[in-house]
């Protein structure tokens, strides 16, 4: 099964390559990710749909995948903590999340057999009330770059964050439903080619 992951995320690429042998990855250009003030579940769905609309469907791939992940502000279910654009922005986000629980939302769209399938899931993560020294270490490491909410659960923040509810894949960028669908599709494509 030949998968095209339309995402610049190294983490997403690594996750798919861990499970599927043939993954090509390309970044989408020009997708507007600014969304009006809606519940985060609707925001990730909207952005994933825009990404799906921008994917050039071709015969070189069997499956196409797009995804969007946002961290919900613990104080406002319609405010997303997206990717910080500076160290100062990352500090602000991590201070907001430190010592608290928050939701992480992912929407994943999978195109196969001539149709898109959308799934949206959330997970709850609790971040320790870590010290200012740890905050400085997290910022200086650059682990916040390109990460929703300014952290990477599978990176340095993994020492200070606990998954309370939901799937780790949801926090890292894909819904579990989509991962299960991809596994089913792989079986289907394997059978059809044998």
Segments the model singles out, each with a brief description of its role:
Residues 1-21:
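N-terminal beta1-alpha1 ligand-phosphate binding loop
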Residues 8, 28, 113:
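Cofactor-binding loop segments of dinucleotide-utilizing enzymes, especially the Rossmann-like FAD-
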Residues 12, 32-34, 180:
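Flexible, glycine-rich phosphate/dinucleotide-binding loops
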